[in-house]
């Protein structure tokens, strides 16, 4: 079954926007604050953002086969993570612009340990969005624990900023 990419394009545009906004918010944090870890989350803010961006890049590589997304830089700075995420945004736009078969099986091999996975395109794409939402939420929790208000990165705020959503507050 071939999927329409239009719905996916909006979802992935939000994914890239939200991740980039969160990275931008963390650029103002000190090195000590970036090492903040909250119980129940993946780990320190910086490590979680690196993990999120690198996995996003890896998923693009697995799905597209484009070696430009075959990077592994676990020491990347936040500025480098931001650049990588912007590059991912271009990659997702290009990937989603072609006809996609949600049932096409994609084979993944982990270079570090040989782990292999076969999964349909539809599941891989859903996992990218789920993974991003989960880790952005964890970083927002850690930022909040520092007494800092995290950026508003929900879908409706994205839509408002992109001019795709209009809201009207009733008269009080």
Which positions does each model-derived feature cover?
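Short, contiguous alpha-helical
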Residues: 9-72, 112-172
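Helix-adjacent hinge/juxtasegments
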Residues: 65-105
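SAM-dependent methyltransferase
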Residues: 105-111
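Short, Lys/Arg-enriched N-terminal segments with co-localized hydrophobic residues
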Residues: 1-2
């Amino acid at each position: 079954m071939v999927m329409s990419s239009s719905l996916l394009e909006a979802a992935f545009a939000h994914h890239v926007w939200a991740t980039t906004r969160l990275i931008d918010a963390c650029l103002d944090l000190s090195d000590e604050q970036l090492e903040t870890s909250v119980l129940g989350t993946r780990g320190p803010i910086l490590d979680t953002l690196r993990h999120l961006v690198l996995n996003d890049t890896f998923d693009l590589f697995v799905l597209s086969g484009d070696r430009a997304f075959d990077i592994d830089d676990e020491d990347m700075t936040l500025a480098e993570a931001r650049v990588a995420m912007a590059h991912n945004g271009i990659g997702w736009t290009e990937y989603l612009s072609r006809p996609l078969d949600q049932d096409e099986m994609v084979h993944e091999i982990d270079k570090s340990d040989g782990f292999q996975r076969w999964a349909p395109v539809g599941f891989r794409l859903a996992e990218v969005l789920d993974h991003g939402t989960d880790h952005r939420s964890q970083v927002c929790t850690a930022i909040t624990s520092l007494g800092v208000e995290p950026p508003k990165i929900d879908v409706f705020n994205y839509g408002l900023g992109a001019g795709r959503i209009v809201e009207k507050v009733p008269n009080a």
